[in-house]
């Protein structure tokens, strides 16, 4: 999937199509040139589009001409009949629907990551529809565009040339925290196809339950596919206990191997590849419950990590993966690799013996040993390993693909080392976050990601082609700890998945206002088809304070930190608390400063001279699911000389965790004169983080 090679093919493809249009005296504008109303109905936006005169009625008889095989013709006819039920494809119609492979797909050179095979050309006139592509994938996407253009049985005439920007355009669905029926997954595959997405990543195993039938290890589903507590929260509150199907109150389920074969086949008919994820070595409490012999020795507390020193662990994993590969033809197999604590390994005699025998110095290298061994096994079966970006720690397996979720830096570093990467940073791609003003939303996980923020993401950014060529694409992830129902799942997926789809497909994105107009239309289409998206028309939006710059006495003044802020949440550094900038609903937006040290927040602000003060206030962020809490104690001291301080205010607060998300302002009002103000905020018994954005003084 070398970028220059693709661009050559794409430009050649484009020049032929543009030349044909030029013969009619028209020029095909790029996406950035067109008027928004011209493509008001299309997501993702096509690479190039021109509106022409007239319309085509999709009713009555239409002559169907194609050069595909009989089986492919039947599939296309079924797709068209479903999309346009009032249209009859036969030989009697005067109007023509022509769908052609050019060159014939059996002669076309195709590779797994070649985006040109997904491109297509579409021309609609009052009497004819022409769709051309070099593969059935391209023809399929051309028909999807045709479906989106339809309005009450009519198609506006136009010319389109189109091909995706990225080869990988995916979504991950967490099936462990909450189990989703097969029919529900098939429904989401229909929506993915409509949006030209081509990868469904199923997170099939985790502490909350094993969801795939493994015939050699039946206890995985017999003992852990059901649990006590219908929701993930209830399960956690009741001690994370597993159950058997016949137990009273048991909740859960799993996919039989036939279920998964059905899902794979349904997806393949829509040119979607299903990628399975089997977590290892962490997030494996359910495995250890079913097969405790895979646990480390001398474990004194709850542990979710497989014992890497135990050779039976590798026998188990290889046997499981053999059954996985028999069901999923995907080139990629995801092995997780994230958030392993590794603590048990340090005390486990078998793990220590493994480290000594392999010359490993750290437990991170021990995990890398497992990853590399699994990669060799998968490579030997013609597959490629994908892992979350923790697999970068220790030593990256030679042929592994990294799924970068903890920001973009790891992904970029991966590409510079010559490895392929799939970008899925939490700030832009995690669909389990609040999508609007948090108090107005169902409980979500962590922070806030609006449709606009999601749409703003560009995986390659301004990276040079030599690096960008290793970015396979992007993926939206829906973790489902706080998503207990199917309607809620769709509420979190849509409309933000529309932004993921356009970010993965479109070369020259339009402005957000244009995209939002198109998203509103697609939202209505989804509702008409039985989906349950968030209603974008009711969106409240970003925190109002973030949209303005504050002016107060402390702006630009010197700040001394007696306790450091966290390196991974620095905001704007030493000036963050006096820069006049408020944070929004996202604690990772670069305006909130995070504190996790023993003393949490402890700073002194020098106003430069003694000044009268009537108000000192600070806003604090709370997200219980992210272990961020408002302070349990705030103390303010003042001084004229910076040496001798007097207490101005000292208050204790009860931290209310009944509300997952809030921004709380704590303030002192009165009258005092001072030059130095020391502000301290401490945590209570809950511990966790403290986040604030500004200490305001008036």
Spans of features found by a protein language model:
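Flexible loop/turn segments at secondary-structure boundaries
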Residues: 72, 179-181, 207-213, 281-287, ...
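Flexible, acidic glycine-rich loops studded with aromatic residues
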Residues: 385-390, 395-400, 406-548
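Bacterial Sec-dependent N-terminal signal peptides
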Residues: 1-26
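Contiguous, structured surface segment used for ligand recognition
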Residues: 25-166, 488, 503-534, 538
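Aromatic, loop-rich ligand-recognition surfaces of beta-strand-rich domains
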Residues: 584-649, 660-698
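Active-site neighborhood of glycoside hydrolase catalytic domains
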Residues: 287, 293-297, 301-398, 405-412
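Feature activates predominantly on carbohydrate-active enzymes
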Residues: 108, 112-314, 318-332, 373, ...
